[in-house]
Structures are given as C-alpha cells and as structure tokens.
Amino acid sequence: MRTLLTILTVGSLAAHAPEDPSDLLQHVKFQSSNFENILTWDSGPEGTPDTVYSIEYKTYGERDWVAKKGCQRITRKSCNLTVETGNLTELYYARVTAVSAGGRSATKMTDRFSSLQHTTLKPPDVTCISKVRSIQMIVHPTPTPIRAGDGHRLTLEDIFHDLFYHLELQVNRTYQMHLGGKQREYEFFGLTPDTEFLGTIMICVPTWAKESAPYMCRVKTLPDRTWTYSFSGAFLFSMGFLVAVLCYLSYRYVTKPPAPPNSLNVQRVLTFQPLRFIQEHVLIPVFDLSGPSSLAQPVQYSQIRVSGPREPAGAPQRHSLSEITYLGQPDISILQPSNVPPPQILSPLSYAPNAAPEVGPPSYAPQVTPEAQFPFYAPQAISKVQPSSYAPQATPDSWPPSYGVCMEGSGKDSPTGTLSSPKHLRPKGQLQKEPPAGSCMLGGLSLQEVTSLAMEESQEAKSLHQPLGICTDRTSDPNVLHSGEEGTPQYLKGQLPLLSSVQIEGHPMSLPLQPPSRPCSPSDQGPSPWGLLESLVCPKDEAKSPAPETSDLEQPTELDSLFRGLALTVQWES
C-alpha cells in the first residue's frame, strides 16, 4: 500500500513542476551601438520555427512591466527599445516570453542595462583626400538617435564631452605618423609622391574607457606633375605666340598695298637723272631800251658756256641732253619793261669765272671756275676774287617767270646767218632801247648790266606776261634768219618763262661769248612783253664759239656776281 501512495505522489509532483526555459529561450540581452538599444535573444534546443515571442520592459525601481508595442507574439528574435530606453540617466530591464506550438512557454529577463555604460562606438565617418605630398583626413560628426529637449538629434561629441580622435598613418607597416585632437580636419605633410599609405582613425572616450572600432582607408599620394605643367604651360605659350605672329603676318599681308606694275615705274622708263650738273650754257639777254615803252622790248641772247666739275680720267660718259639740273628763280623777275625814254649808260659789270671744286654744297655757294671770255671781247687777265654768298631779293610787281631752251640738232651743218640789222652790235657798256618789237639781238651787254638796269627800272614796270624764246640748231625761220657764221645757234620765236635753270655737262672748257648771228623774233602776233630767260638746256657737244672780239672789253667779275644779279641758286650733286 505504501508503495502505491509513493508512486502517486511523485507523479503528481512531476505534473506540477515548471518547465526549464533554456529549452525554448536563451541569450536574452541588450545590444547598444551609438545609443541605439536593440533587445536580442536566441531560441533554445527545443525551439521551433512556429514559436512566438512577446517583449516587456520596465525602468529600474518599478514593479510593473510594460509590454512593448509592436513586439508581441512575433517570430523574429530582436526588438528595438531605443525610444523606451532613451533616458541616459536611467537603468532598464527587459524580458522575453516564448510560447511553443505545443503550448509550452518560457520567460527570461535581461540584466540591468545602462546606455552610457553599455553602448559601443561605431567607426567614425572619415573622408581621406590624397595630394602630391600630403594626405588630408576630414572626420564627419557621428549622429545618435538620442534627441534633446528641443527635438534635435545629438551627436557623440554632444554626449561625450571628452571625446577625441586618434589618427595613424603608416607605410608598409614600418613608417607611422600619429595625429590626435578634437578638431575634425587633419593633414599629414611631407609624404612621398605616388606612394600608398594606410590610415586609421578611432574615436576615444577616456571617461568611459571607450574606443571605437578603427576606420581604415588606403590612400595613394598623387604623382608629381610639376614638370608636366611647366612643359604644358611653355607649349601653350609658344603656340599662343605662334598664333599671334601668324595673325600679325596675315594682317600685314592683307593690309599691305599692292606693288605698282612695272609700267608705272618711272625710274626704269626715264633715262635722265635730275639734279646732276654737266656742262653749262647760259644765254645772256641783251635789251634795247630805246624803243617806245608801250611796246614789248625784244631780247637778244649771248651764249656762254661754263665748264662743270672735272671728271676723273676713264670715267664713263654721262648722258648728254637727258641728264639735266635746274636752278630755279621762280618768283624774282630780272628785267621789267620801263617807260624811261632816254637810254641809260650803265657801268659794265664784268663776269669772271674761276676754277671750281668738283662738288659743291647743296645750296648755292659761288665756286672758283676756269677762266672764260665773253663773246665780242678781247681776252683779259682774270682776277681771282673771293666768292660772295648769294642772297635773293624779292622785287615788287614781279612778273611770271619764263625760260629758254637751247637744243642741239643738225644746225652745225646748216648755213650760218648774220644779224639782220647792224644795230644788233653795239659797244660794250651801252644799253639802248630798240623800237621794233620783233627783233632780238645778241650784243656786248653783260649779264650784270642787264641785271642792274632791271633793278633800277623795277619800280616803274607793269606786270606783263613774259615772252618765251627757244634756241635751236635744228630748224631756222627764213623770215627772221639770214646768212651768218657757221655753227652759230638759231633762234625760233616762241614764249618761254624766265631763266631759272642751267645745264652743265661734263667737260671743262673756256667761257667765250658766242654771239648769235640770227635774230630771234619773240612772236609774230604783234607786240608782246619782253622778258628774260629763266631756264636753259643745251647739249655738251655744241660747236665751240668763235674767237672773241677784241673791242670794248668788259672788266670780268666772279661767277657769283652773275647768279647774284639773276637771283639764281646753283645746286651741285656729287
């Protein structure tokens, strides 16, 4: 009987004994990282997939448990209690109840939990920037789910006031550099270009003895491309300079005026060369002032040949007629018509050329020339006098200038002529007016006499048009010319401006005066104003003048007296 009662008692006690929770539920605990609190657990050996779990929590010191909404009869094995355990100064408890499909249940509670103490720190968020010789590391702030009283989320720096960062940089695990501090930006200097480094960054909280997991980054410094940049800059500068030069050359080529055609090149077409002195021929006008003042007075010309600068032996022959030089006197008239009826006897002014040097100054300076003789005069000894400078004088009521041309033709072989009237020849030193206006005589009146007479009568003269006369050896006027000496130049009627230039050809020679044997009629159209030649051109090979006459010799003067009287300017070209 006693044995039966013992079996019944043990069976009833076994039926009322609690189940072991380790068979259905185990490892219930809080896992907190950066103050994110997660409750986790594992199922026991007898747990099945259809086992459900329910979670409850309470603050330390309270008796009642609070069921967690959203974590009742769940099959997952975790529940987030961050909000329910967000107070950093409180301690919390949590428990899990597991119920199997067979009706078995098990409950297990966590240990006391403090977020400040039990939370762990995650690795920081860092940005590594590689440079040529340095590596820069920027630590970003780590946010937490904890909210402040105003609702904004706190960071680790806000929660742990003694938090600081520890940085380490190493190369091949041999060379290490360390930096630390509370700032968020760090940079390692003095690194080798094009080298790989391993960086490690950790968060340290000394008060709670916490260290975060290290953040690791592999960074390679940049290669040194300074020479590449220098070369590129030099290349770009060279290309820019080349483009600028090409643009400038293109602009110059486009804006350059086109070259004139050869047909417009006058220097190739013309054969004469201006301002080149060769042998000089001068026509000295002789006036007859005895005629009525209302008629223009005829002009006769005495030809003078003056030798130019000597050329060295063997020098090439210069161009004869085409190479000329003009000595201008455009504004000063030498002779003007006069109404003074009585003839005036002027003291003769002699012309004395002297030897001249080869080259003269640009403006006229009288030079010493070889001795010369006037026509119709006996040779005389020439006195050497210092040349005087020429100063042109302007006269009132100046006439328009005129000129004369002596041209070479076939007149050397033509019959010579004589003056149509004997009054063409007169004693030296006498100047008479001739009534006829159509005759032109060559006589013994020197150029200085004519100049003196013109200067005295300049106040009484009227402004009249000057007649132009042309002296030529090519043709002759049968109405004007008569037979005379052979080789004398012939004179054609025409109108020329005043004498303003002298042509000098190459060979030096004496200065005899050659009287023309044929009269020159200025015009056939009635009275015309008389004037003085201003320009003269003669060839160098003109026939030499006959021997000068011996009667009534004039006292010779210097060459500068002639040009001073005529107000001419002589320019020499080397």
Swiss-Prot record:
Pfam family, one: Tissue_fac
UniProt modified residues of type Phosphoserine: 410, 414
Disulfide bonds: 71-79, 128-217
Location relative to the cell: Cell membrane
Transmembrane residue ranges: 229-249
Glycan-linked positions: 80, 172
Annotated membrane topology: Single-pass type I membrane protein
UniProtKB keywords: Cell membrane, Disulfide bond, Glycoprotein, Membrane, Phosphoprotein, Receptor, Repeat, Signal, Transmembrane, Transmembrane helix, Ubl conjugation
Main location: membrane
Cytoplasmic-side segments: 250-574
Tissue expression as described in the entry: Expressed in colon, liver, lung, pancreas and kidney. No expression in immune cells such as monocytes, T-cells, and NK-cells. Expressed in keratinocytes of normal skin as well as in psoriatic skin lesion. Detected in normal blood brain barrier endothelial cells as well as in multiple sclerosis lesions; Strongly expressed on central nervous system vessels within infiltrated multiple sclerosis lesions. Overexpressed in synovial fluid cells from rheumatoid arthritis and spondyloarthropathy patients.
One GO CC term on file: plasma membrane
GO molecular function, one term: interleukin-20 binding
Annotated signal peptide: 1-15
InterPro entries per the UniProt record, alphabetical: FN3_dom, FN3_sf, Ig-like_fold, Type-II_Cytokine-TF_Rcpt
Extracellular topological domain residue ranges: 16-228
Miscellaneous: Failure of medical and surgical therapy in Chronic rhinosinusitis with nasal polyps is associated with decreased expression of IL22RA1.
Family named by the database record: Belongs to the type II cytokine receptor family.
Subunit field text: Heterodimer with IL10RB and with IL20RB. IL22 binding to heterodimer is greater than binding to IL22RA1 alone. Interacts with FBXW12; the interaction promotes ubiquitination of IL22RA1.
Protein name from the UniProt record: Interleukin-22 receptor subunit alpha-1
Native organism: Homo sapiens
Gene designation: IL22RA1
